From Swiss-Prot:
Record has Zinc as a keyword: yes
E.C. number: 2.3.2.27
One Pfam family of this chain: zf-RING_2
Protein name: RING-H2 finger protein ATL57
Top-rank EC class of the record's enzyme: transferase
Record localization: Membrane
GO cellular component labels: membrane
InterPro entries documented for this protein: ATL1/ATL16-like, Znf_RING, Znf_RING/FYVE/PHD
Family of the protein in this entry: Belongs to the RING-type zinc finger family. ATL subfamily.
Length: 237
């Protein structure tokens, strides 16, 4: 009976693979340590693509604001000057760029000034320019262009200065002086009789002055009469 049990134990031992295989299995199990799982990586603060996109948008907004302010300031400054394209094309085409840049610019505060009467402007003499006449000025000081032979010009009788017809008409519509010498007397003495009679405002002002003068004279005569009467009464007493 004992031998049978021993045989069964040997068979079981051999079936398990022997002692060496058993020890190797035990050593492998005990020697292999458990590998810890790596910790999760923290999320990135800002993606590089997103940062580049935000930077480009900020630069674009900056340039848009800068150019909008610049063009608005340029438009405001250019609106305060008079457009010289309204001048006659025949004269503006002859003007050089240097003279064009130094043309007369009319500012806003002087737009309300009242110039010469239109009838007086039309009464200025007009003739054709000739170099043989030896005029006082050989170019128009308003548009800064030279006179051409046979060109129609307008002269101011008192000082003798000549200008282009359109230029001097535009000037005299805002001013009452010569553009060159700034003299406020435009007509000579012999042409004064040809001027139109004074307007209604000046006539009323003249009548008012006459009435005031008459009242002053009457008051002075009354005061002198009263003084004379009082003097006679004192002498009689």
């Amino acid at each position: 009976m004992e031998t049978k049990h021993l045989r069964k134990l040997l068979q079981l031992y051999q079936a398990c693979g022997g002692e060496q295989e058993l020890t190797k299995t035990v050593q492998n199990v005990t020697s292999s340590p458990l590998t810890p799982t790596p910790p999760p990586q923290p999320p990135s603060a800002l993606d590089s693509t997103m940062a580049l996109t935000i930077f480009i948008l900020l630069v674009a907004l900056f340039f848009m604001g800068f150019f909008s302010v610049y063009f608005r300031h340029f438009a405001d400054s250019s609106s305060s000057t008079v457009d010289i394209s309204s001048m006659p094309r025949t004269r503006s085409s002859r003007m050089s760029p240097r003279r064009l840049s130094t043309s007369v610019v009319v500012s806003r505060p002087y737009s309300f000034r009242r110039g010469l009467d239109s009838q007086a402007v039309r009464s200025l003499p007009v003739y054709r320019y000739t170099k043989a006449a030896k005029q006082r000025n050989e170019d128009c000081v308003i548009c800064l262009s030279d006179f051409e032979e046979g060109e129609t010009v307008k002269v101011i009788p008192h000082c003798g200065h000549v200008f282009h017809v359109d230029c001097v008409d535009t000037w005299l519509s805002s001013y009452v002086t010569c553009p060159l010498c700034r003299s406020n007397q435009l007509f000579s003495d012999k042409d004064l009789g040809m001027q139109e009679p004074p307007d209604q405002d000046s006539a009323e002002e003249h009548d008012t002055c006459d009435g005031v003068d008459t009242c002053v004279r009457r008051c002075s005569s009354c005061s002198s009469l009263g003084q004379r009467t009082g003097l006679e009464r004192s002498l009689s007493l």
